[in-house]
């Protein structure tokens, strides 16, 4: 590993952790946030949030131009639905040319169903390198030295290997992603299954999570195949490997959202899976792939169908072979 200048754009829970991690393993790090954001103000005043404390040698900045100019590698961790408008902002900065961008989000563009690397590439792809950083793990575990495995994916295997070499450690073991389509679809849709798992918890049907895991991976592997990816990727770290952290963990925002939704309770944290449910509705049409679980969630979230009635309808679907 060589010492790099790295900027992390986005100072939410995950972005702040990535900055903390990159600094911890020896890189020079700048963390960017919007000047008036609650997270940035808190970090500027205290250098800590609810999960971790930043080292004094990690620089904070609210200047996007400064953050881009500083770094060789730029990591983006913002809401997936804000990526297109944010990329348009970045595209106004001449210094983005030749940089390597790593997208550290798990989502799809709700209106188009496009993968985040597609969205970003459309706007700033020329003369830049684009990769994704995905897989299981919670900030609360990592900062307590509980290790996990993750994936780096890119259309350029040389870029993938370089990033893994610079970020691999005894806290996070990275694997080379070989299927960008499958990795991105898998990472985004595990949040959808997390919402479904939370709904099962709220309905006292938690024992159905095993069936959700089996059938959820099956329907999403069909989608990945239709999109030109490798169906086996769904059974790797980006999707199935992230189920423990998403379907069972008390830290999972998507699981907690699903549970709160069926119980009629308020939940004010970001649950990226909600927008991904919309994207899957679009992809199901585009690729003519049946996605019964994802479609059921769409009906519950956006058409006000009763969750328990919708689950019963899934059970009344025609009997078929498992594989």
Summary of predicted features, one role per range:
Residues 1-62, 70:
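NAD(P)+-binding Rossmann beta1-loop-alpha1 motif at the extreme N-terminus of oxidoreductases
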Residues 197-198, 225-235, 240-323:
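NAD(P)-dependent Rossmann-like dehydrogenase/reductase catalytic/cofactor-binding core
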